[in-house]
């Protein structure tokens, strides 16, 4: 019951589902999505990982690998009575075969990846902490 097409959540993925009252904060859904993307961009930049936005309907974030962009962060939301439900998921080291069985967010499964598959060095705990800090700057 969220926006976006079919997705998959599983082990090796960080799923963040905050409940935010946008009406109270006087923000719209686009502002919120932009904020989620910016939080991730800043947190990953603090870990020397550059994320990219794509200019299309399919929101989320990509990393570059061999001159190709691979999606590692997905955003899917539900807006009801001023409240945002659901949120985002980040592919750290999950089994990507699960995406072969679906049409993930309307993309071809070859466009989906994880930090592990792309052999990007990362410290999961540090990224978690940096995401938390960036989230707190924006929403608290």
Enumerate the predicted regions with their spans:
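Catalytic beta-strand/loop module used to bind and position nucleotide/cofactor moieties
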Residues: 1-3, 8-11, 18-140
């Amino acid at each position: 019951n969220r926006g976006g097409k079919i997705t998959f959540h599983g082990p090796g993925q960080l799923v963040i589902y905050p409940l935010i009252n946008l009406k109270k904060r006087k923000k719209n859904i686009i502002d919120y999505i932009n904020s989620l993307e910016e939080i991730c961009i800043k947190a990953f930049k603090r870990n020397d990982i550059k994320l990219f936005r794509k200019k299309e309907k399919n929101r989320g974030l990509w990393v570059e690998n061999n001159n190709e962009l691979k999606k590692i962060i997905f955003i899917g939301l539900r807006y009801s009575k001023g409240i945002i439900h659901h949120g985002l998921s980040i592919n750290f080291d999950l089994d990507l075969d699960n995406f072969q069985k679906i049409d993930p967010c309307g993309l071809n499964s070859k466009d989906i990846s994880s930090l592990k598959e792309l052999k990007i060095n990362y410290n999961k705990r540090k990224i978690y902490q940096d995401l938390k800090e960036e989230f707190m700057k924006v929403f608290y």
